[in-house]
Amino acid sequence: MAKKSKVKKTLVDQILDKAKIDHDSLSFNGLEGELPEDVARESIYKNLALNGDKTGPVIGIVPITEHLSEKKLAKISGNKKVQMIPQKDLQKTTGYVHGANNPVGIRQKHNFPIYIDQSAQEAGFLIVSAGEIGRSIRINSQDLADFVNAEFADIKE
């Protein structure tokens, strides 16, 4: 009888397990192909890393179906303007490659301000990257915000 292959936990899963924060591990690529039946595209959030002119790096988390308002994020984060960190500098800044940025891992390594669009708070949960491409977590929005010291705000266009 063949052994059932067990999916290896990501570092984000391990951190959340150690902190006893309830979450579901998911394996799919939200930007490509079919989604699992129980996953709505609007519940998947992207983690965007930007540079503020006053604060330095700042993280904005919005649904993949929406666009981030740089103007709103700048205002809420105490900057005059923010701009996306160039992809070539992303891993050096956050520790993650494009598509694997996640609030849990970033908070463990850096003290960057993190802002989550208020739509996640209204929905009650969100799906974000688990630190590896093709791996995600479904987590209670407030639990995530509390754990990574994030603030909910209106940051989408």
Please give the residue ranges for each predicted region:
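Extended, low-hydrophobicity, polar/charged segments
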Residues: 1-157
